[in-house]
Amino acid sequence: MKSAHRFPGIALATAVASLGGGIAAADESIYFSELPVVASVSRLPQRLADAPTAVTVIDRDMIKASGVRDLNDVFRLVPGFQTYPHTTEPARVSYHGLNDEDYSPRVQVLIDGRSMYSPLFGNGVNWATIPVALDDIERIEVVRGTNSVSYGSNAFLGVINIITVDPALTRGLSVSVSHGSQNVRDQALRLGGQIGEVGDFRLTYRQLNDDALADRGDWIDNFRSRLVDFRADMALDERNSLQINAGQAEGVTGVGRLNGGRLFGQPTNPIRSLRQTNTYAQLTWRHASSPNSDHQLRYAYVADRSDDAFNIVVPLVPAQVFHINQSGDEGIRHELEFLSNQSLGAVGRIAWGASWRNDTMRSAWVLPGQGTVQRETGRIFGNWEGKPASWLTTNLGLAGENDSLAGFSWSPRLSANFHANAENTIRVGYSRAQRTGSIHDYRADYWSSLTKYQFRADPNMPTERLDTWELGYLGDWRDWRASLDVRLFDEKIHDRLYIIDRDASNIPGNSIPSLTMPIQDVRIRGIEYQLKWQPFEPTRLVLGQTFTDIDSDYLASALSYPKGTLSRPSDYSNIEQLTERSTPRRATSLLWMQALPYKLQFSLAGYWQDKMKWSKNTWSEKYRRFDVRLAYPFRWATWGGEVAYTVQSLNGGHNEYKWSGDPNDRVVDRRQWLTLRLDY
């Protein structure tokens, strides 16, 4: 169906005109820092002006000023990204929509190079167990656009690369406590020090606790998490270094239903705790063979586990007790990657490498009788950067991936960056990517009850395919202490995957299971930009805006089941809307950071988002949200620290996940807390 809505073409012109005519040039004696160097796109350290696609960099100051407690919230500041808070549903982070899965599988998430994608969570990311504390993040590089060339099929629409702080910068002791409404009770302890003469370490313990959204209707929401994280960096000699990461993150969420009252829960879905853990270890060896050449070998181990066990008592004679644990599963990943960066002299630079990954999953519920299911993936990749002229940078990338469940695929990318001068760059690029399904999609086989055959995987399920054209502009106006990043995109997704019930008649004894299959071709078009401006020394502004239009067409094969999900007009329309309205047609974010007298620091984050859908049968209505933070850093004898007061949703309650006008709606109410941090 072709949407009648089109994004306004005047947005960029308005932004540029306001810069050109509405501001006064800043004092040139005041230094405005250069645009950062990023390595998340091509795996080569590159200026933003040379990178083959758009990148948003979120630094430590932005993270702190945004007033977030949960990491997923910070991506509201990135053009094209959407998220919502932890509720009884898992939090998601998506780019350009298509977010119907519980654990978003189309944006790769990395922490110090380690993928957060899990075979347990549908080959997606579980934000409840993200193993990093906000205070330990140095910066986040967000690649806005497909990057399967560099990171594989999970980087289908983009990459979030989280880089943690060098332990050498965190020596000493740091303690923080937060206390506020909705039972916010957070504690953190960080210890950093030296490892003899060879390196430094950082050890962090963090605990978060809150009652989340106000209890409504038949559900109770609460969330708590614990994290232990260790990092050590050691210089083995002048050319070799070793980085060690290890730890565990745990998230506990309330799930289940009350059937409209707290005394009588649903026997088959009682109120209970869903416990999830992420245990990890990583070794990274780096070798500098010359000033222009280095190599890296990385091994990572990650184990994800979940559990929500309960008993069902059937009143027979004698009574029968059934032990149910739908989430009692385990997913384990071993990954080995080699990466080499080399200078080719006048020919350019190249980053190339190879990786091997072994995923296993065990689940008595969705993989009954199959024991431990294994999946192996091997990749080779390369990215070349050339500068044939001072006004031109070219990037060429190619990757091949062989998946034991999905087969072999290629991912190419080509871009050209035209530098009009040192301040203005135009970028044109094309890329192709493929996204594979999860172990569940290829191997699951289970009944949901004695009368319903719920799901049977298709071992020959095809992959999603993406062709992307983009036109970008990057302005680095140092005299004005401002930068502007613009991306126009045309993304065509072929064979979008979705779970379809081939017999939705709900007749007892139904033996035709659902499966994941291609249902649509999707086209995503739009424009997004981010403006960073420091009009005065104590003032920083970050403005982001996105206009997006999604069209979709059903495939004939998806409509071929006369009793299937898509044979019902309501489901046909709802799934079509779930695709086309899976991202807001217009979304805006603004972050204002202001230094005040007496060392006070003030910040305001504002978000304006149009109506969209996170689930098939509900809507997230249009909303505005404002978060504020006021902080006072201090020094007392040998102690330093900060007192901060934060308010989220200052303008009151609103909906971010779903809204249907009944008590089950998820309403985000005002939340406020006070934080004290002491550093020694």
Region roles according to the model:
Residues 71-74, 92-96, 107-112, 127-130, ...:
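N-terminal periplasmic accessory domains that precede
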